[in-house]
Amino acid sequence: MVAPRLASMAQQFKTSTELVQVTDIVYLARGHAVNWVLVADDSGVLMIDAGYPGDRQEVLASLRKLGYQPGDVRAILLTHAHVDHLGSAIWFASEYGTPVYCHADEVGHAKREYLEQVAVFDVALRIWRPRWAIWGVHLISKGGLIRDGIPTAQALTNMTGAELPGRPMAVFTPGHTTGHCSYLVDGVLASGDALITGHPLLRHRGPQLLPEIFSHSQQDCLRSLSALALLETEILAPGHGDLWRGPIREATDAAAALAQ
């Protein structure tokens, strides 16, 4: 029974990237283990998060599906600067000078002035578990050990946000990292890792938090759920997992209950 279970777990990493149209201008790209969001309107295309460094070809493929080339990306917004969300943005910033924005409290992290990420030692302690072993191999294959940052990363201001495709509104959601930020665009909440609906390490599917080991402050994660619950949206585009529809308070309440 062990081999079929391992094969089932590994299958999560073998599917091709899926691009889901959420609204007229918002698309959720479902990568092998992480998501990113594309916002395309008459003013151009915006990316929210950028997958692992090794997800670059999948990111480019998702842009091509909408008729865009890498040089067409107006800007990249980071929900946070973990390598599975910042990864391909390193290349965009270096090769095309693409502006990369995040919350002011996350800029130093994006520049790699410091690293606020789960310790390799803590992962190693769990690597004997099948899910962790498979995820670890995938992480390494996608460049998850790269420590490069984005020297040009800058803080997103209200004025800048108003000029970007979809006019994204920043929603400060610290906890997973000190400067984690979600974005509300065209009625869709791009929540990054403040609120997810699935992950290769997790059996449960549905609104939830990532395991506490991955977050800077679990208490801040819970407080951020309370902040998200106040938003007027019924569409959740998470950093990991499936698109979720329904009152956002139902999602945050479910995640908070699981975290107790």
What spans do the regions from the language model cover?
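Conserved beta-strand hairpin/beta-sheet module of binuclear metal-dependent hydrolase folds
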Residues: 14-66, 182-197
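Blade/loop signatures of beta-propeller domains
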Residues: 2-18
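Binuclear metal-ion centers of metallo-dependent hydrolases, dominated by the metallo-beta-lactamase
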Residues: 243-260
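Active-site metal-binding motif and surrounding structural segment of the metallo-beta-lactamase
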Residues: 56-107
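Short, solvent-exposed beta-strand-terminating loops
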Residues: 104-118, 188-199
